[in-house]
Amino acid sequence: FVILTLLVEFYDGQGSTSKSREFLKLGELQNLVSERLKAGLALEQEREQDGTNLYTEMYENVLDYKSMSEAYESLKSAETGSRSKYTKEGYVSIICEFLDRQGLIVFVREDEMIKTTAKLDNVMEYKILNKENYARIMEALGETYE
């Protein structure tokens, strides 16, 4: 979910280029993940109250926001600079370090800054951001796409 959120923030899939920003701060990504998990959980609960069972009607297209939200919120919030895997900051940082090792982003730990690489830009531009795939990603994140 963290990776999906990162991708949606960097690439909006509209206009002559799909890339919508040059960098993202780690703290901003962490806040966006929390906000999107809360929004997805609220949508999931709303659908359950309306009698729409997400897991039987749309099982393949839906993320389990309840479990993800519980797991993410169970992580501690720590002071700036903490990199323990048991904190939200550390968890998001570990994911960014993984993406950095894969050559998909440049993660500058000192500045807590995330930038995409040409490798990720090309993958997103030519493989992921066709209309069908972008709409599925946005739907999974609880966003509407037109």
Predicted stretch roles:
Residues 41-67:
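Histidine/lysine/aspartate-rich catalytic loop segments that bind and position anionic ligands
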Residues 68-81, 120-146:
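Short, amphipathic alpha-helical interaction segments positioned at domain boundaries
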Residues 26-36, 58, 119-128:
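Eukaryote-specific, cytoplasm-facing alpha-helical/coiled-coil scaffolding segments in long proteins
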Residues 112-119:
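Minor-groove-contacting beta-hairpin "wing" of winged helix-turn-helix DNA-binding domains
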Residues 84-101:
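Short amphipathic alpha-helical interaction segments
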